[in-house]
């Protein structure tokens, strides 16, 4: 882990938001 939990979470959210989907929302849609 080279990132703090906050930094990593923000990095993931930023990537997902760029595609127009949030991690939780995407999981709910695919579930």
Curated annotation (Swiss-Prot):
Keyword presence, S-adenosyl-L-methionine: no
Job description of the protein: Cleaved by the protease thrombin to yield monomers which, together with fibrinogen alpha (FGA) and fibrinogen gamma (FGG), polymerize to form an insoluble fibrin matrix. Fibrin has a major function in hemostasis as one of the primary components of blood clots. In addition, functions during the early stages of wound repair to stabilize the lesion and guide cell migration during re-epithelialization. Was originally thought to be essential for platelet aggregation, based on in vitro studies using anticoagulated blood.
GO cellular-component term (any): extracellular region
Chain positions covered by the region annotation Disordered: 1-31
Composition bias, Acidic residues: 1-10
Gene name of the encoded protein: FGB
Compositionally biased tracts (Basic and acidic residues): 18-31
Name of the protein in question: Fibrinogen beta chain
Location (main, coarse): secreted
PTM comment, free text: Conversion of fibrinogen to fibrin is triggered by thrombin, which cleaves fibrinopeptides A and B from alpha and beta chains, and thus exposes the N-terminal polymerization sites responsible for the formation of the soft clot.
Subcellular location: Secreted
Domain of life (superkingdom): Eukaryota
Modified residue annotations for Sulfotyrosine: 2-3
GO biological process terms, semicolon-separated: adaptive immune response; blood coagulation; innate immune response
Keywords on record: Adaptive immunity, Blood coagulation, Coiled coil, Disulfide bond, Hemostasis, Immunity, Innate immunity, Secreted, Sulfation
Organism, as annotated: Canis lupus familiaris
Subunit (UniProt): Heterohexamer; disulfide linked. Contains 2 sets of 3 non-identical chains (alpha, beta and gamma). The 2 heterotrimers are in head to head conformation with the N-termini in a small central domain.
Comment block on domains: A long coiled coil structure formed by 3 polypeptide chains connects the central nodule to the C-terminal domains (distal nodules). The long C-terminal ends of the alpha chains fold back, contributing a fourth strand to the coiled coil structure.
């Amino acid at each position: 882990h080279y990132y703090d939990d906050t930094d990593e979470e923000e990095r993931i959210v930023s990537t997902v938001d760029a595609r127009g989907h949030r991690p939780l929302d995407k999981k709910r849609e695919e579930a």
